[in-house]
Structure formats: C-alpha cells, structure tokens
C-alpha cells in the first residue's frame, strides 16, 4: 500500500506553553479550520476536544498530551495537502514530564505566549527542554485582545529572557479591544478575518497609514534575517536591497530549521484571528520528518547507529506515552522513525527483551479514534494489544535490533502514604496504582516494609492529588492520604565493647546465652558504591561460643538493627565483632544466643553515642537574578548549605544541600518568592546527622 501523503508533507508538531497562555484554545481552532471539529470547543465551557480526561475539563488545565492528526492546504489553498500531527502538551510544572516526553518525539513546535503576561516560568522550562532536544520552533503571541496585550513587548521579552533570536513576520493592527487583524510583513498587506464565519474567510487590504513606517522597519529586519541563510541570498540582497517572496520564505525556513531564528506570529485564538496564518507558518517553516537529523540509536552491542526517516529502512519506533482507554484497554502511543508497521505484525522490545504482537493500530483525534491498517516513517499513532511496554521503550524489527535513546525521567521528590477506605478496595487499589505507574514514569509506588503502608511518590503535590483523583474516578477506589513523610535512620558514632548474658532458670531446662560483642561505625561501600548497612565478624577462639550458635548471635543483632534503639528507625553503618562468651551444655540454645545478641546491641549502641540520620537532598534552583537574595535566604532558613552558583540563560543556578524534612511545601513557596519564575529539582544525596534539638523532638514523638 503506497503512502497517501508524501513524507515531505508531514509535520509533527507540539503546541506548548505556560498554563493559561491559551494553548488548548489554539489547538481547538486548528482543528476547526482544518475541518475536523465543526463546533469549536471552548475551554471555559469545559468542552475542549483535546482535554478529554474529566479532571482536565473540571480544572481547565491540560494534563496528558492528546495526539491528533489533521490536514491543511493553506489559507488560500496555496499548498498541496499537508498532514499535521499535533500533540497538545500540559503547561503545569508538575507535568513537565509530559512535555519532555512529547518534545522528544516531535520535529517542530509552536510555542504559545500570552500577549499580556508574556514569558512566564513554565515557558522558560519548556524553552529549555526544546533547546535540549534541538526542536525548531515558531512563536504565536496569543490573546492580543486582552487588556495590556503588546506584541512587540512580548517579542522583546523572548529575546532577553529566553535568549532567542526572534524575527516577527507579522505586526498587529490595534490591540486589546481594538485588535482587528495582522499585517503580513512578507506580502505587505493587512489581513482582516471575517467575524461572520468565525474567521474561515478573510480580506487582504492596504496597511493602515499609521502603521506603514513600523511595518517597513520590521520588514527590513525580517529580510536581513532571511538573507543570512546563504551567500546567494546575501549577495542578491546586497545588490538590490530586496528579496522575492519565495526567497524570503526559503531563507527564513532554512534558518528556522537550523535553530538560528524563531519566527513570531500574533493573534487571538478565542476571537478566531491569526491561527490560520500560524498553520501556514507550520507548513512553510517547520520541518518534515526527513528534514531533521536522522534519529540516533544504539545496536544491541552498544555501538552508535542512526535510522533515516524512510519507509525502506527497518522498522523502529519509540513508545512515548501509555494511556488506559475504557473501551479498548491499553493504548501505546508510538512515533515511527523508520520503516512500516502493519496491524498484526510482531515487534521486538529490546529494552525488555520481549517479542510482542500489535493487535490494532488507531489514529487518534483527541479521544475519538479511526482504525488504520499500517503506519509508516513519520507517523504518530496508538497501538492496541501491547502488554509489557513502558514509556520510553523502543519497538523495532526483530531482525534488525536498535535501541533509541532512553528517556531520562526525574526522581520523584515527594511521597505520601495511601490506604484504601475499605479493606475490599485493597486489591483494586494495587491494580489501579500499577496501571498509573506504567503510564507515568515520574510516579512510583512501593510498599513500606516497616509499616506495611503503600507509599506513592511523584513530582509535586498537584501531581499526587491528580493520581488520587484518577484512582477515584477511573478505578472507583476511595483512598485516605497521609502527610508527606521522611525516612530517618539511626547509627553509632564510637567504638564500644559490650557484654550481654541471657539466663533463665524456671525448673527443668533453662536458657543460657552469654556473649561479648565489639560495636563500631562501619565505613565500607559495596560494589555499587552504596554504604554498607551491617557487617558481622566472628573472632571467637577455642569454641567458647559453639559454631552452631554464632549465626543466631548475628541474627539477633540484625533484627534489633531493623527496630533501631532510639526512635524505632532502622540502623545503618554498624560493624559487630563477636570475640568472647560462654555456654551451658544443657541450657544453651539458638534462641538464648539470639536474645543475647539483640541485648548486646540495645545496651551497646547507647554507650556508642547512637544518633539519628536524615536524608539530605541535592537541590538545584534556577532563579532570575532579581530574586536571588530571597531564594538564598529561604534556603538558609531551611538549614540548607549553599555549595555553589552558576549562570545560565534563565538566570542564576543555586546548588545546595538541604534536609528533605525542610523541603515540604517548597514548590509552592519558591513560586511565591519568585512570583512563579524560579524552578527547582532535587535528588537524594546522602544521610547525615540530625541536629540535637531536632533529634530530641523525633525521639519524643516516637516515645509518646
């Protein structure tokens, strides 16, 4: 079966932005103008086509990236039909993982900014992620009808804050409630969209006299930017001071594809103005799958390789998202980089080392689906029937195995205990959490061995709220959620020798175990470089403690280690040496020596200066210069130690070590200190001793 659309006419794009820049509305308008969605879904009615999870419609924010396929031939039908695959991405900081995952599989992006609030914190995060994956992008300054909207101010902010080389290809006519249309700087005409038919048709009119001069200045800047694309264009421009429309398009496209410039468009999606021109921009300036560098991968032996975007190359695709669908079960969204996959084909998953069969393939439109027979290089689709696939896995031809880059997922930073409200829900809860964890790699589930509780961990408080919410709605499990927890540990600080004797006489056979144990701090690491928890050494000579009882002594010490000696937290970093003791022919038993061992640790640890340890996190905060002092002051108040500072395009980077116990609520706090412009990440670094006053409180709360 030949291709319906040539690969050059594909565009895989993401629409990304900060919460509330109007990203979902922009996507809705794209679906409307491309003829897919006859009634435009308004976000504030909770009816947007792309926001298909209930929580999204309720909160008016987009949580999961829905993928949609649509077609466009231009505002004047000036292009052949192009196929545009769109991924709508969330803008909330707790869901950065979704954005990262989408950018990984896109060829280009439209970044939406609000005309009045301009560059916001999440836009800085998204921009950083797009830089990381080298994604060419164009900018749409939306909400030009809002009060305070100013297109040129937002372009200037993008230059200074995001260090991007912005080239406007349009200029707005009026702003706020007087926003009427845009000037096309390439054709030097004003575009006025028809309000009667929701902007489906438009008129080209002369540029208003008061904007003529500014339009000409901006046009000169744009032509200079286009001319820098090649020596031929530069020569032509220097000779005649002008370029033809085609040459301008050609020059701008070449520079966008090289990530040298970012073109800026403006409009108001809500008022049906400007989105159509952005669609033309996507076709004109963003790359087709075969115009971006071939995807890098590794062979099974770890040798570097790459896969060209071609149907003739062996099949390779990346599973970039999993979703559970109420009707068909698991959906695995894939981006096909090379080759062809037909429904019913077997694929190999080198990450899991398993072969799987693809049942059906569907093309998604938000959450409606059309079944298709095959997918080819450049396609984005969802497979039904894959059982053991995790986000970030590669699917490939079994005869020609490659592993695409693994996605790096951040470690969760916050944990809470959850328990089902009724015993009957226990199993349902386990199944629900398992499914949610497979869908979202930044969310983890584990059972705490000490308390038997189920602990869930994620990227932030909103992230975990939504997980608990989805358990309730999709899996009908009601759960109670505890407060965020810290995993403390205990250890000893000095060397001590301890005698312990367990003797019981109560008529008949008694109990007798007698040991001398030396306890000292253990500073050894295992083969992974992790600190060792416990080491037991046997130095008994002359059989004063018989061989068969030595294991019992070790076991008694180890059991007591798990229960701690100060506040019930497990002890780590302890070396125990059994060097003497005595036994009784009749009364000694394994049990007696086990109890003697645990008594020795209980008594000895107190003399060996036992103390409490807490997890210390490596925290990195990126903040604009203006808030540096406040952010550092706040870290100091949290018992943080500032290790160093760096510069980066988004501001200053502070590296600090901060106790986890002081980091709860930090996400909300750092946002309010920096008016939402600072972002942070943290990961576990080491255990360190807790200050005495805090240790006293921990022990007190344990004993009460």
Curated annotation (Swiss-Prot):
GO terms for biological process: ribosome disassembly. GO terms for cellular component: cytoplasm. It comes from the Bacteria. It is found in: Cytoplasm. The keyword Secreted does not apply. SUPFAM superfamilies: EF-G C-terminal domain-like, P-loop containing nucleoside triphosphate hydrolases, Ribosomal protein S5 domain 2-like, Translation proteins. It holds the Pfam family EFG_III. The keyword DNA-binding does not apply. GTP binds at residues 17-24, 88-92, 142-145. Residues 8-290 form the tr-type G domain. One of its GO terms (molecular function) is translation elongation factor activity. Keywords: Cytoplasm, Elongation factor, GTP-binding, Nucleotide-binding, Protein biosynthesis. PROSITE patterns: G_TR_1, G_TR_2. Belongs to the TRAFAC class translation factor GTPase superfamily. Classic translation factor GTPase family. EF-G/EF-2 subfamily. Catalyzes the GTP-dependent ribosomal translocation step during translation elongation. During this step, the ribosome changes from the pre-translocational (PRE) to the post-translocational (POST) state as the newly formed A-site-bound peptidyl-tRNA and P-site-bound deacylated tRNA move to the P and E sites, respectively. Catalyzes the coordinated movement of the two tRNA molecules, the mRNA and conformational changes in the ribosome. This is Elongation factor G. The gene is fusA.
